[in-house]
């Protein structure tokens, strides 16, 4: 038949996709809901306090266990007031997360980042520490990748000592696509460092994103299926400890 080769190729492609879906069904996944964080792109107006509460209550109705509830800055945001009300209401904070920078400024690694400081004052315990590994604003010959690893270790220790010994600490590889393209060795060095920490010191997990819109889902998927996910699953995931 003239279409035998085409039919065979289509069948093989479908079989590969079915294998991927079968693997997904067996993975022990968590959902970290990010609905409360406001978008910085295409948003006409900010959230009100009432908006925050409505979103939070709807997310809880969905049954999601892990929820991101804030992103802080030096200015007072709606997030600050919302978190104060949330904690004062007696809400369980053990599975609530908030974003924080890893450093206060490029040339200031000593000051506790405002995100961590606000988490301490508001009573949150689970930080998502955001890092960039391919940015030019850092002189990587002066502040080396080993310095970044050391700083992450210090932030993790601070969080467990100051926020809670049971803190579920996440590290977000914020510029993951650019790091994979331009600074793959630096990226793997950091991930390998985090994964090689003793079980009691490791982060709860790693996050990564594609915030630029420059890369197709297939590209990010290929990276996810590669070395980075090996490190994440084998070393870092809390589910294996």
Walk through the language-model features, giving the residues of each.
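Alpha/beta enzyme core
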Residues: 2-5, 38-66, 85, 89, ...
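N-terminal amphipathic alpha-helix/helix-capping segment at the start of soluble metabolic enzymes
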Residues: 2-45
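Short linear motifs at secondary-structure transitions and domain/linker junctions
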Residues: 4-10, 72-75, 183
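A short helix-to-beta-strand connector/capping loop
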Residues: 27, 92-94, 201-203
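Terminal or standalone catalytic/regulatory effector modules within metabolic enzymes
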Residues: 54, 64-77, 81
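Short catalytic-loop micro-motif centered on adjacent basic/acidic residues
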Residues: 67-70, 98, 241
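N-terminal active-site wall of soluble small-molecule enzyme domains
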Residues: 73-99, 103-115
